[in-house]
């Protein structure tokens, strides 16, 4: 069995205003830095063998807090990077709703059919994270693996782990500095904890529903 701990990065400077980040690279907010420390404190109780992170700053800095508490290195992994939002990158949700109303509707209602103009499709994200998870299963059997990623690849990972269609993409909560625990067993994957945020206390902020 692999014990998989999926982590969403702590709050970035753009999260509170509802700005699509994609492959752009804002820093953690001051609240996000506090969230990352609280998350690291929470996970310090676990035995951890390896930590993977998306190479973007908001994920890597979150992963570093976890790694330093356990004296581990962080392995940067391109396959778990955020979706390329293309033309939406850097735009506020309200701006996207006004400029691309039909595309926004499709993203909220039919995400499995979306390919961002100048960017990436959800199917592409699914394929890359599924390949990564298959490699984790083979390489880290009988280990505990932390994966620090973003909302879109994490929701795609949940779909891959449970064998459900990408149309169910929005069915999984994914707040900043949350973590989930999944047992990757021989015949099935079992979600034991999903979107845990109780360690954040007063620094918890509910994620925007359309990002």
From Swiss-Prot:
It catalyses: O-phospho-L-serine + H2O = L-serine + phosphate; O-phospho-D-serine + H2O = D-serine + phosphate. Its EC number is 3.1.3.3. GO terms for cellular component: cytoplasm. Keywords: Amino-acid biosynthesis, Hydrolase, Serine biosynthesis. The keyword Hydrolase applies. Pathway: Amino-acid biosynthesis; L-serine biosynthesis; L-serine from 3-phospho-D-glycerate: step 3/3. It comes from the Bacteria. InterPro entries: His_Pase_superF_clade-1, His_PPase_superfam, PGM_Phosphatase. The record marks 58 as: Important for activity. Gene3D superfamilies: Phosphoglycerate mutase-like (3.40.50.1240). Activity is not inhibited by EDTA in vitro, nor enhanced by the addition of Mg(2+). GO terms for molecular function: L-phosphoserine phosphatase activity. Homodimer. Can also form a heterodimer with PspB. Catalyzes the dephosphorylation of L-phosphoserine to serine and inorganic phosphate. Is poorly or not active toward D-phosphoserine, DL-phosphothreonine, 3-phosphoglycerate, para-nitrophenylphosphate, and fructose-6-phosphate. Does not display phosphoglycerate mutase activity. This is Phosphoserine phosphatase 1.
